[in-house]
C-alpha cells in the first residue's frame, strides 16, 4: 500500500513540476528527435489514417479547443475525487494539530488504516461543493445559513452511519450545551456555516482552477489511481472495524481472511489507530 502511495505522490509532483516548467513541450521535442519518436509518429499517423477512413468527420482537437475543454471542467467526478483527496488530507492534518494543541498529546485522526486521510472531511468537502455551488454568487449570509444546516445534518448522519454499520462512535458531544443527541451541536453547526462561506467563496474556486491545469491524460490516470487506492483502503478499513467488534463475542477466526485481520489489525492496533473510538456493541 505504501508503495502505491509513493508512486501516486511521485506522479502527482511530477504533474505539478510539468505545469510549472513546461516540461511536456520539452519532452515532446526530445521525442521528436529520437528514433523511437519517429517510429511512434509513424504508428500514430497510421492509426489516425484508419480512424479518418472509419469516421470521415473526425479531426484533432486544436490548442484553442484544448483550452476550452480542460481536464475536470466544472463540477464533475474527476474534480470531486481530487476535492475529496485534498480535503481528506488537509482535514486530517488540521484536526491532528488542533487536538494536539487542545489535549496536549498527539493522536491519529485518520479514518482509514493507511495514510493521513479523514473521510469525514473529504466527503464533507464534496457535499458542500455539490450542494452549495448554486449559491456561490449569492450573499455570504445565504451560504452561511445553508452550510449551517447542511454541515450539521451531515455530521449527525455520519455519526448515525458509523454506529449502525460498524457499532462505533467516533465523537460524542453529550457534555456540550445545545447538542443534538451528542452527534452534533450548535457551535459546530456555526463552524460549518463559516467553513461553507470560506470554502465556496475562496478555497474551492482556487482549487478548481488548479485541478483544471492538470494535463488531461495524466489527470485521468491519477484520478483512477486515487479511486482504486482509496476504495481498497476503505474496504480494508471496514473489514478491520467489523472484525474488531465481532472479536469480543467470537474470538476465533472463521476463515483465513479473519486470521489475517486478527494478525495485522488486532485490538491494540485498532485502539492506537482510533483512540477516541467507542465500540457500542462491545459495551453491550
Model segments located where?
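Aromatic-rich, lipid-facing transmembrane alpha helices and their immediate juxtamembrane interface loops
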Residues: 1-284
Amino acid at each position: 500500500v505504501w508503495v502505491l502511495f509513493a508512486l501516486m505522490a511521485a506522479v502527482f509532483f511530477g504533474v505539478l513540476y510539468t505545469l510549472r516548467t513546461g516540461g511536456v513541450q520539452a519532452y515532446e521535442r526530445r521525442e521528436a528527435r529520437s528514433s523511437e519518436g519517429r517510429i511512434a509518429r509513424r504508428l500514430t499517423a497510421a492509426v489516425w489514417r484508419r480512424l479518418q477512413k472509419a469516421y470521415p468527420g473526425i479531426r484533432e482537437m486544436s490548442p484553442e479547443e484544448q483550452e476550452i475543454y480542460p481536464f475536470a471542467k466544472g463540477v464533475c467526478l474527476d474534480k470531486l475525487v481530487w476535492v475529496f483527496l485534498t480535503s481528506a488530507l488537509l482535514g486530517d492534518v488540521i484536526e491532528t494539530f488542533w487536538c494536539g494543541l487542545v489535549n496536549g498529546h498527539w493522536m491519529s485522526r485518520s479514518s482509514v488504516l493507511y495514510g493521513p486521510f479523514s473521510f469525514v472531511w473529504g466527503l464533507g468537502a464534496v457535499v458542500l461543493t455539490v450542494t452549495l455551488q448554486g449559491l456561490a454568487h449569492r450573499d455570504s449570509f445565504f451560504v452561511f445559513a445553508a452550510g449551517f444546516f447542511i454541515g450539521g445534518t451531515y455530521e449527525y448522519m455520519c455519526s448515525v452511519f458509523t454506529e449502525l454499520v460498524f457499532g462505533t462512535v467516533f465523537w460524542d458531544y453529550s457534555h456540550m450545551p445545545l447538542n443534538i443527541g451528542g452527534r452534533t451541536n450548535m457551535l459546530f453547526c456555526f463552524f460549518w456555516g463559516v467553513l461553507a462561506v470560506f470554502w465556496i467563496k475562496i478555497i474551492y474556486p482556487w482549487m478548481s482552477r488548479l485541478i483544471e491545469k492538470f494535463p488531461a491524460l495524466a489527470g485521468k490516470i491519477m484520478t483512477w489511481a486515487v479511486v482504486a487506492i482509496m476504495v481498497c483502503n476503505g474496504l480494508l478499513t471496514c473489514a478491520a472495524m467489523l472484525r474488531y467488534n465481532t472479536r469480543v463475542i467470537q474470538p476465533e477466526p472463521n476463515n483465513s481472511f479473519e486470521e489475517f485481520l486478527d494478525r495485522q489489525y488486532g485490538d491494540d492496533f485498532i485502539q492506537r489507530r482510533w483512540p477516541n473510538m467507542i465500540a457500542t456493541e462491545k459495551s453491550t
